[in-house]
Each structure stands twice: as C-alpha cells, then as structure tokens.
C-alpha cells in the first residue's frame, strides 16, 4: 500500500510541503517538495559498492524542467524536452556545490541526484525547491551524508532583507542571493547585486543562513519518521607505516618543489618526484596499490602547502597572503572588433571582446517561467591550451557555462539601460592562460573591452578570488589565489564590483566552521584587492570612449505616430523589406512608434530616416509634391507621392485644356508635380497636375516632360 509521509511548514511567505513514500519506491530515496504550487520531484540512487579502482567521488546531479509543469508543449521540432538548457545546467551546479563537500573523505560510491520540475507557479522559482529536495532525499537515503542542508534566496528591497522573494519582488530588489548551509555553517553563496556594501552582503548571507534553519529542522523530523538505516560504510583504514615511508621519501623534495614559482616548472618537478617515489616503493613491494600511493602523495602535497601558509611563510609563488600578482592591462588589441582588451594577472590571462548589435541580435529564451529577451550576452571559453594540455574542443561544458554566468553577474550592475544605449551587447572571454581565477579575470577584461567599445557603463568593475587555509582556530585568508591554492585550500571566495560596492559574490566552502568573522576578513581583504586592480585598470582606460567603433552599427532612433506603423511595414512587410534593401540598413519598429535604424554608414541611416519621414508624413491639402506616375487609366492617372501613398489625377486635372488621351501627356514612371486637392474620409487623395504647374511654372505645358522623355 502507498503510505505517504508528509511534513508541512511555513517558510517566509510560502508554505513548503515535503512528501515521501508515495513515488519512485525503487530509488534509494525520493521526495516531492512543493512551495506554493511549484513542485520538484527529487530522487537519489546510491550504489552500495564502489567500482574497483575508483579514485574519485562520482556524484552526478541532473536538474530537468518539464514544460507540462507550466501547462505548455515544447516548441522544438520533436515536441519534447532535449538537452539541458543553460539555466538547467546552472541550477544543477547550484544543487551540486553545497552537497558535494558533505560526503565523507574516501567515499567513492556512485551517487546520482535527479531533480524534475513537475509543477510551477510563475512567482516561485524552482531552484530553492530543488535544493531543499536534494537535501531531504540524501538525508532520507541512508547514504553517508553529513547533512541536511537548508537553502534560501535573499532579496534587498527598501533597505530590508526579504526571504524567498517572488519573481515580481525580485524585479524591485537590489540583490538576488542564494545561500545554502548546514545547521552550523554556510557552505555556498551565489549572488548578484546592485553595488551593495560588504556589510550589506554579509548581512544577507547571515540572514539567509538563520532563516533556513526551519528547513533543516523539518528535514530532520522527516528523517526520524521515514529515514532509511544509515549505510554501514567505513573509510579504508590508514596504513600509518606506508604513510611514513612515503613521507620519508617525498615530503622534503615536495617542499622544495613548492618553492618553484613558475607553474609549469613546478608541475614538472612535482610529477618527477611522484613518479620516482612510486617507482621506488613498487620496486620494494610490488603488491602496493599505485592509486593508494598517489592519494598519500596528494595528502603530503596538501599538507606542505597548507602548513607553510599557516606558519606565515611566503606562498607557492613567493607572495605574502594579501599580495596581488603582477598586472598587465591593454585595450584595443584587436583592430576590427568593436572593443577588445587583454587582461593578464600573473599566469592567468583573458582576451576579451565586446560586440554591439541591434535588438534583432538579442537572445530569446524560452524558459519554464515564460519567454524573455536577453540583450546582454556573456560567453566564457576555456580551451585546453590555457593550462598546457590537449583536449576536446566543442560545445561549452558545465564549468564554462557557470563561469560565464558569474562573470556576467559581475558586469550586469553597471550595464546601461536599453533606452539609453539601444544595443544588444555580447562579451566573449577567451582564457588564453589559467592559473587561478579566470572568471574574475574575465570580469576585469569585460569592463575594459566594454569601455574600449564605447559602451557607457556606469563604472569600471574588477573581480578577485580569495582563498582560505584553516586548521582548528588558526586560519589565513589569501588574496588572488593560484589554482593550487584553490585546489588545496578550504574556500573559493570570488568577489566582483566597482569602487562603490559589490556586483557579484560567489562562495564555495569545503569545510564546516566558516564563521561570520572569517567572511568579514575575506570581504574586507577582497575590497582592498579590488581597489588595487581598478587603479591599474584606470591607467589603461578610465572612462568609456566617447564614440563607438567605426565598425559597429550606429543606431538612430526616431519616433513616428503609432497609427503610421502599418504604412512603414506595408502589406506582408513589403514596404519595410524594400526600405532595408534600398538603404542598406536594419530597421526595427516598436509598438509605441519608436523606430530604430542601424547602419555602419551614417549616410545610409540618414537616407532611411528621410524615407521613413516621407512615408509617415501627413498629406497636406494645397501642398505641391513631386510624384511618379504608377498607373494610367482612361479617366486619368495614379501618381505615387511618396510614403506608399497614391492619388488620382483626373483627366480634367492634367492640363489647362481638354485632354482626349492621357498617354499624350503622361508616361509610366514619369515624375510630375502634383497639388493635393482633397483627402476624403476613406483616405483617398485627389491630385492636380494642372494646378501644380500653374503654381510653380505658369508657362510650362504638362506634355513637355513626356516629349523630352520620349525623344
């Protein structure tokens, strides 16, 4: 019999329901989590035995949105969901990051978490719901997991923190921050902000962590009712004698190797030491496991680097804890791009470009919450050569998507509004060298490239990555971490912003016990580093260029009467198509009558504006126009007077004498002056050549142009 176990609780302004025991009973654990009609079904499956020779933890997190959740059918050719979207990939990473550190050291059994959005309230984002579901399912499963975790979104509206704001509230918020953690400590932060202070950001993290305790309490209560027995898993016993033998052979040599400041030289020396140590030990005892020896050597490496930092000694590359690596900043490095910059910090380098396009180049995103248009695109590429390796080059991986989104968040707060700068902007960061914090180098490079392109950003922005080494109560916060310090340390803490405040904060913590005080030290140290980098950047370019690149499209905006839009577009788009072909421009018309003309040549834009003004001009009775004969009939001729408007010249209005045959006076395509006699209620226009000729050239006969044309 199906016997669901349900817990319901209030979480901010929303009601959360946790339900288990009803569905997917063959999975290790399954939970349906709902928050005000947004429901996510989360399953966990764990393998009881690890694969032989497995030397890493194979955790997979899949997050998938089903369009039926929003009452829609997919718009793809096959009418079903396909590969994960960028948004789905980012939420999968959001779930993965806080749960991964909570599995015990040495646990290498395969675990898969699948979160499926099955119902959605447009006001409630499913990401927090999915994170709560993953935490609950893992806690129920019996898999060794040191959770549960809570998750919260924090907004900042009218100088007040708001817990789990709705989508409408987020539009008014100066902050969008997601925080996840255990009962005791924060594990992950992901945020974007409108240049808030360090204290405001830290306050949001603390607020979110305090508020999510109700989630943790309710998951614990659910586990008491429905949790499966904890797996009888024990880590492999430590071979103290082997550890001591490996340390005797390698520790001193590794300590010396980690004094080599050049990354490639250091890596080469470390590889030699590891290979020689393993070869020596296998020669002594061929029954030893090479993977186990590699793990022991890695632990020694970690200890060497960490103990040196905690003792106050210089870091791997000889710097003090708060020193920034050498900076090299250049702009305008690519001749035909709209904006470009090369930003180098130590052995991390980013070649960043900015490209300007029209509204037609904006990305239309068909999301579960509805369709939206994105006019600021940020793409991050991490080729294998950047770390001296070979590899597959193809579509972006999860890491590239995540780093690109973080860099975008760092820049978004200073981007101009579309009404002030009506361009779609694409920034691409090519990581050409990498040794720590390439995403923050991308933020710095993007700021420089945008200013080089003449984009009127509100302020320059820079980013910095901080690290942490902590043993007991002793800790050291490191500025501008290397790749090794990230890998061997306890925290990856990235901060981007301007001189006025923070635009993005991302934090991933690998240990428990990170206090508010440690985060405060990290934020303050990051501010000093950010201001230093901005100072160097400002020496290269301190304000956006006064004009955009000669190779960029120039957008000219004019306003027309909304009633005239149909005239500019024409039947089936015929007029606007002809206009774009005739003038060589791109023309976009909005419902309010705003017309945007984009062209790389100013004369072409002027021509297009002139033609649109002709089309939309009101026909004035009594005014003389130059028109072109488009049709000849027995009773007169139809003459186009611009703007797609056509009027009739009656046979009696062609000349000041009796006309027997229209073609004696007019030819197809002939240009003639015409005077507007009348515009009736149906918009029909009555014209006169006779009166126009009398008004401008009283002596000229109307048949003269025809005679000239016929010679």
Swiss-Prot record:
Binding-site positions, Mg(2+): 486, 492
Top-rank EC class of the record's enzyme: transferase
Keyword entries, A-Z: Cytoplasm, Magnesium, Metal-binding, Nucleotidyltransferase, RNA-binding, Transferase
GO MF annotation list: 3'-5'-RNA exonuclease activity; magnesium ion binding; polyribonucleotide nucleotidyltransferase activity; RNA binding
Cofactor(s), by name: Mg(2+)
Chief place where the protein resides: cytoplasm
EC annotation from Swiss-Prot or TrEMBL: 2.7.7.8
Domain of life, per lineage: Bacteria
Pfam families per record: KH_1, PNPase, RNase_PH, RNase_PH_C, S1
Keyword Nucleotidyltransferase set for record: yes
Classification via SUPFAM superfamilies: Eukaryotic type KH-domain (KH-domain type I), Nucleic acid-binding proteins, Polynucleotide phosphorylase/guanosine pentaphosphate synthase (PNPase/GPSI), domain 3, Ribonuclease PH domain 2-like, Ribosomal protein S5 domain 2-like
Keyword Nucleotidyltransferase: yes
Residue span(s) of domain S1 motif: 622-690
Gene Ontology annotations of biological process type: mRNA catabolic process; RNA processing
Domain KH: 553-612
Biased composition (Low complexity): 694-711
GO CC annotation: cytosol
Region described as Disordered: 690-711
UniProt-annotated location(s): Cytoplasm
Record's catalysed reaction(s): RNA(n+1) + phosphate = RNA(n) + a ribonucleoside 5'-diphosphate
NCBIfam families (alphabetical): polynuc_phos (TIGR03591), PRK11824.1 (NF008805)
Protein family according to the UniProt entry: Belongs to the polyribonucleotide nucleotidyltransferase family.
Oligomeric form and interacting partners: Component of the RNA degradosome, which is a multiprotein complex involved in RNA processing and mRNA degradation.
Function: Involved in mRNA degradation. Catalyzes the phosphorolysis of single-stranded polyribonucleotides processively in the 3'- to 5'-direction.
PANTHER family: POLYRIBONUCLEOTIDE NUCLEOTIDYLTRANSFERASE, POLYRIBONUCLEOTIDE NUCLEOTIDYLTRANSFERASE 1, MITOCHONDRIAL
Protein name: Polyribonucleotide nucleotidyltransferase
Organism of this sequence: Shigella dysenteriae serotype 1 (strain Sd197)
Lineage: Bacteria, Pseudomonadati, Pseudomonadota, Gammaproteobacteria, Enterobacterales
């Amino acid at each position: 019999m199906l016997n669901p176990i349900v817990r319901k609780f209030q979480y901010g302004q929303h009601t959360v329901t946790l339900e288990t025991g009803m569905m997917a009973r063959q999975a290790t654990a399954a939970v349906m989590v709902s928050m005000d009609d947004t429901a996510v079904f989360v399953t966990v499956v764990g393998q009881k035995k690890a694969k032989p020779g497995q030397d890493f933890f194979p955790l997979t997190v899949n997050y998938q949105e089903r369009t039926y959740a929003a009452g829609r059918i997919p718009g793809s050719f096959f009418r079903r969901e396909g590969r994960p979207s960028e948004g789905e990939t980012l939420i999968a990473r959001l779930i993965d990051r806080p749960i991964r550190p909570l599995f015990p050291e040495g646990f290498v059994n395969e675990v898969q978490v699948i979160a499926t959005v099955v119902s959605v309230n447009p006001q409630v984002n499913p990401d927090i719901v999915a994170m709560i579901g993953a935490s609950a399912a893992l806690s129920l499963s019996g898999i060794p997991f040191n959770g549960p975790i809570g998750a919260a979104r924090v907004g900042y509206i009218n100088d007040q923190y708001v817990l789990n704001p709705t989508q409408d509230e987020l539009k008014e918020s100066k902050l969008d921050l997601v925080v996840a953690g255990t009962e005791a400590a924060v594990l992950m932060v992901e945020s974007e902000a409108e240049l808030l202070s360090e204290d405001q950001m830290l306050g949001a993290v603390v607020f979110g962590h305090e508020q999510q305790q109700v989630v943790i309490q309710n998951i614990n209560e659910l586990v008491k009712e429905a949790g499966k027995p904890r797996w009888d898993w024990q880590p492999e016993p430590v071979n103290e004698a082997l550890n001591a033998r490996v340390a005797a052979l390698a520790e001193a040599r590794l300590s010396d190797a980690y004094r080599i400041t050049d990354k490639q030289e250091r890596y080469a020396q470390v590889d030699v030491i590891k290979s020689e140590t393993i070869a020596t030990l296998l020669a002594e005892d061929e029954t030893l496991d090479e993977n186990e020896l590699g793990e022991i050597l890695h632990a020694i490496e970690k200890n060497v680097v960490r103990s040196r930092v905690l003792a106050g000694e210089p870091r791997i590359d000889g710097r003090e804890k708060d020193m920034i690596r050498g900076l090299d900043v250049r702009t305008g490095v690519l001749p035909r791009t709209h904006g470009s910059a090369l930003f180098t910090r130590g052995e991390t380098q980013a070649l960043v470009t900015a490209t300007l396009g029209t509204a037609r180049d904006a990305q239309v995103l068909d999301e579960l919450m509805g369709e939206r248009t994105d006019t600021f695109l940020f793409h991050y590429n991490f080729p294998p050569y950047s770390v001296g390796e070979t590899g597959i080059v193809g579509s972006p991986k999860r890491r590239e998507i995540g780093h690109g989104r973080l860099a975008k968040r760092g820049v978004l707060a200073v981007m101009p509004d579309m009404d002030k700068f009506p361009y779609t902007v694409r920034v691409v960061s090519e990581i050409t060298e990498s040794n720590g914090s390439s995403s923050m180098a991308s933020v710095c490079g993007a700021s420089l490239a945008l200013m080089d392109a003449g984009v009127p950003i509100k302020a320059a922005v820079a980013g910095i990555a901080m690290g942490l080494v902590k043993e007991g109560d002793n800790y050291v916060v490191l500025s501008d971490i290397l790749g090794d310090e990230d890998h061997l340390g306890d925290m990856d803490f990235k901060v981007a912003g301007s001189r006025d405040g923070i635009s993005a904060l991302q934090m991933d913590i690998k240990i428990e016990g990170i206090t508010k005080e440690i985060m405060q030290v990290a934020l303050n140290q990051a501010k000093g580093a950010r201001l230093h980098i901005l100072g160097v950047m400002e020496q290269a370019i301190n304000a956006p260029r006064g004009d955009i690149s000669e190779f960029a499209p120039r957008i000219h905006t004019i306003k027309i009467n909304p009633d005239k839009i149909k005239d500019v577009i024409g039947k089936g788009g015929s007029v606007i198509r002809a206009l774009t072909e005739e003038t060589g421009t791109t023309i976009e018309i909005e419902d309010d009558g705003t017309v945007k003309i984009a062209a790389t040549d100013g004369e072409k834009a002027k021509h297009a504006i002139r033609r649109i003004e002709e089309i939309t001009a009101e026909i004035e009775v009594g005014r003389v126009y130059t028109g072109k004969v488009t049709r000849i009939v027995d009773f007169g001729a139809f003459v186009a007077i611009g703007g797609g408007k056509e009027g009739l010249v009656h046979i009696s209005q062609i000349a000041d004498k009796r006309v027997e045959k229209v073609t004696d006076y007019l030819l197809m395509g002939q240009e003639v002056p015409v005077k507007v006699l009348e515009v009736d209620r149906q918009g029909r226009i009555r014209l006169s050549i006779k009166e126009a000729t009398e008004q401008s050239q009283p002596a000229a006969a109307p048949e003269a142009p025809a005679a000239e044309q016929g010679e």
